[in-house]
C-alpha cells in the first residue's frame, strides 16, 4: 500500500493504462513523500453500466468513475485534497474522464495493515516529519 484503485465504465489499451499508472505513482510518491515501489495501481474496467451516480435530485443515474485511495492514516486533509486533485487531473488528461463524474474516496490504514515482503514487512505508521524527510525515491519510506 498505498493502493490506488480506479473504477471506470470504459475499456482502454494496456499502454494507456500503463501511462496513467506511471503518472499516478510518480505524483503520489512526490506529493506524499513515499517510496514509489510501495504504490500499486488498479484500473478496473467494469464495462458499460458498471458504476453509476445520481448527479442531481430527481435525475436519472449517469455513468461515473471512482478513485479509491487506500493510504496510511494521518495525512492532513489539505494534503489529501491536493493529491486527489492531482490524480484526477491525470485521469482526465489520460483517459478523458469527466471531472464532474469522477469522485475520490480515501480509506486510511495503520502501517501494520500494509505488508510488503520485498520491502521488509509492515509499513511504519505515518509521521508528520516524513513530508520533510527528503526525496520520494528513498527506499525506507512507506505508503
Sequence positions of predicted segments:
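A domain-level signal for the structural core that forms small-molecule/cofactor-binding pockets
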Residues: 1-143
